[in-house]
Amino acid sequence: MSYSKFDLTFKIGQYLDRHLVFPLLEFLAAKETYDQSELLQAKLEILSKTNMIDYVTDIRRMLYPEEDTPEEIIQRRGVVLSELQELQDAVEPVLRLMQRDDVMKTIETMRDPKTLINHLSTNKEYEFKIEMIDSMYRLAKYRYECGNYVESASYLYFCQLVMSPTDKNYLSVLWGKLASEILVQNWDGALDDLTKLREFIDNGGAGSTASNMQALQQRTWLVHWSLFVFFNHVKGRDLIIEMFLYKPLYLNAIQTMCPHILRYLATAVIINRSRRNALKDLVKVIQQEAYTYRDPITEFIEHLYVNFDFEAARRKLNQCQAVLLTDFFLIACLEEFVENARLMIFETFCRIHQVISIGMLAENLNMQPDEAECWIVNLIRNARLDAKIDSKLGHVVMGAQPLSPYQQLVERIDSLAVRSEALTSLVERKHKARNQDIRWGAQEF
């Protein structure tokens, strides 16, 4: 099975700044998923529209080792250095201020941009002029285009402090700061910037003239940029569920513009044991969007919680592993994903069956019987499950926790509902197989 059809790199890349696309291409190159010369060509196309001239030269040498560096690239390098120096000279007083810890501490305590600008302008020692704000923004953008993301983040931070939210460049500053923090992998800073940007967009900060469609586009971009933060920050796996599943404006953006993001939402729910309560809501969304997007990860959820088809879920789990291995954002979650997916299969299986064959369970978990028995023993010990293993018969016998009459009723109803759905699904599948039109073969919808 070719997993390149499940690769979302180029789909996601449409919603990213070109600098953010570059790490994804580097990942693909390391994975050798695509032809290396095609990836080098894609890198060159991205870099040619930036000021990263030295990098452009290196990529060209790899692509065209027999050719000399074109004169226009050599000349452009000189132009970039000259323009950079000119921009730095225009804001030299501000750059000096930023080197002084005492001044920066004072600046950071002033929350009102007008008060801050007045403080900087009236103090002759600072040599600050109001037009330097726009110059600082231009310098930050230029530094960013040169690939100097640390400096860019620092300059954009200053712009955030002195700019009014109504400034024409304020929204661009927020986007630029978020991108810079992502590219230097400062995940705490990136999360702060993501929160500021989301609040700004949601509060209509993009301007009263912004249409609903423009706001939808902004949220769609933010959803994609946030993947870098959510799959790297320690709080990310909770925050992605809150934002993507429980903030209607963002769920609407995903359903309307980018249902492929359901892969990342589903993965976050699977690896987050403390958020199992989100499963029902996730299943509803996956079912609603099944006609527009599906992949092994969303299908795994469907097979397990809609169809109760454990054999199909087992097959999909195999495919899920291959998908995660080739996904820039998810590869680090692979072990957690497999462990939690197996746990979900086990839990669902146990809700339907009281006595479970270890052999059957091992088959559904893609494990050898001995390995499955050891896994179940550890699970019973760590999760404090009321279950026993009969090694002679090769069975797991589920016990019953003492419950109040009310809890017993709720559990009984819940269990009957699960069993009823499982039986209904089984009957439907058998009926479909028996009445299948041989002209069309097997059909999956």
Curated annotation (Swiss-Prot):
Assigned keywords, A-Z: Cytoplasm, Initiation factor, Protein biosynthesis
Subunit (UniProt): Component of the eukaryotic translation initiation factor 3 (eIF-3) complex.
Organism (species): Bombyx mori
Gene (UniProt): eIF3-S6
GO molecular function: translation initiation factor activity
Protein name per UniProt: Eukaryotic translation initiation factor 3 subunit E
Family membership: Belongs to the eIF-3 subunit E family.
Domain of life of the source: Eukaryota
SUPFAM superfamilies per record: Winged helix' DNA-binding domain
Known function: Component of the eukaryotic translation initiation factor 3 (eIF-3) complex, which is involved in protein synthesis of a specialized repertoire of mRNAs and, together with other initiation factors, stimulates binding of mRNA and methionyl-tRNAi to the 40S ribosome. The eIF-3 complex specifically targets and initiates translation of a subset of mRNAs involved in cell proliferation.
